[in-house]
Amino acid sequence: MVMTQRIAVLGATGSIGDSTLAILAAQPQHYDVYALSGYHRLDKLLALCQQFAPKRVGVPTAAVDEFAKRLSEAGLDIEVVGGETGLVDIATDSQTDTVVAAIVGAAGLPSTLAAARAGKRILLANKEALVMAGQVMINAVKTHHATLLPLDSEHNAIFQCLPFAIQQDNTQIHRLNHGVRKLWLTASGGPFLQQSFTQMQQASVAEAVKHPNWSMGQKISVDSATMMNKGLELIEACHLFDLPENKINVVIHPQSIIHSMVEYSDGSFLAQLGSPDMKTPIAHALSYPDRIDSGSQPLDLFALSGLEFIEPDLQKFACLRLAREAMQTGTHATIILNAANEIAVSAFLNNQIRLTDIADINEQALNEIQVSALTETADIDEILAIDNLARQHTEKLVARLV
């Protein structure tokens, strides 16, 4: 690793941003923080600008003037850009080498797709880019010779366990000589693994966001509690590794030590192990194909008391079943599922519905919303139109329960 990479961290104020910037701060000889973006936590974004002095920063359109004023008062000469247009501009900037796509939800799709079309090196934490626009995204990566490296611990683990030829070209996974039989995504089971469905019905927001192993944002923590997070990761894995959903298994592994596995035709299982710390996959992707110090606590094998593997209960965790069904149906269904889930999770976080209502609302949305299937050449406007329709319909479903 000789050249300094210029990094744009989109979603810098979230948990992925925290972990990424901790690594970048410790490796100034390798990385230059060229651009940052944030949405809600602008005080934190200002502090990050003071720490890293990026050349550009993205904020909501309505906040551009005020944020520029605050930067000026702090003695910082940083260009401020606003809204989706600003994020796309940062992602496609000729000075940007690597885009860390860490914006949560559908809001991260346009800038991530733009980065792919600009041939950038993309470190992907935004699941929705593949859940909503999987084949479109993969086609853009290949057509424009971009590089796509997964930051999710599970997908990063699988990536590390695959032969180099498949890492370079996911269609190589079908070659018999590589012998890939199945992929195994591990799941923690979330905070309600040992509780009944009835207990889940009574769960508070505070209980749902208290993940047993990982430190994450509220939305992804709720998704972990319902196992929708694993459902979205299943869809993401299908696109990343060019496999149908029936070639990807999900297993609950409460200790979160094995981050995922690849099963080979000779009976071998290759697994990636590590402490449950997002800095490990982020450091891998930042430095790939080299390795750097992530700053994470090394795994102490002597402290491990045992590793468990449990089959998911698809009645209790219906969101996982819905994700498989949506993947079988097509991209239009995965867009609907993702949009419905975002609205339902928001309603739960606002104490409008129960945790277990999320799966019911998601299933209703899938059953009730009728749209045409998308082709592989669908554009972003078609994708966002289905997303918008699904959100509007789901808002009505939530209103019936409030």
Swiss-Prot record:
One of its GO terms (molecular function) is 1-deoxy-D-xylulose-5-phosphate reductoisomerase activity. Mn(2+) binds at residues 152, 154, 233. The keyword Amino-acid biosynthesis does not apply. NADPH binds at residues 13-16, 126, 128, 217. Pfam families: DXP_redisom_C (PF08436), DXP_reductoisom (PF02670), DXPR_C (PF13288). The gene is dxr. This is 1-deoxy-D-xylulose 5-phosphate reductoisomerase. It catalyses: 2-C-methyl-D-erythritol 4-phosphate + NADP(+) = 1-deoxy-D-xylulose 5-phosphate + NADPH + H(+). Coiled coil: none annotated. The keyword Oxidoreductase applies. Pathway: Isoprenoid biosynthesis; isopentenyl diphosphate biosynthesis via DXP pathway; isopentenyl diphosphate from 1-deoxy-D-xylulose 5-phosphate: step 1/6. Belongs to the DXR family. One of its GO terms (biological process) is isopentenyl diphosphate biosynthetic process, methylerythritol 4-phosphate pathway involved in terpenoid biosynthetic process. Catalyzes the NADPH-dependent rearrangement and reduction of 1-deoxy-D-xylulose-5-phosphate (DXP) to 2-C-methyl-D-erythritol 4-phosphate (MEP). Keywords: Isoprene biosynthesis, Manganese, Metal-binding, NADP, Oxidoreductase. 1-deoxy-D-xylulose 5-phosphate binds at residues 127, 153-154, 188, 211, 224, 229-230, 233. Its EC number is 1.1.1.267. InterPro entries: DXP_reductoisomerase (IPR003821), DXP_reductoisomerase_C (IPR013644), DXP_reductoisomerase_N (IPR013512), DXPR_C (IPR026877), DXPR_C_sf (IPR036169), NAD(P)-bd_dom_sf (IPR036291). Its cofactor is Mg(2+); Mn(2+). PANTHER family: 1-DEOXY-D-XYLULOSE 5-PHOSPHATE REDUCTOISOMERASE, 1-DEOXY-D-XYLULOSE 5-PHOSPHATE REDUCTOISOMERASE, CHLOROPLASTIC.
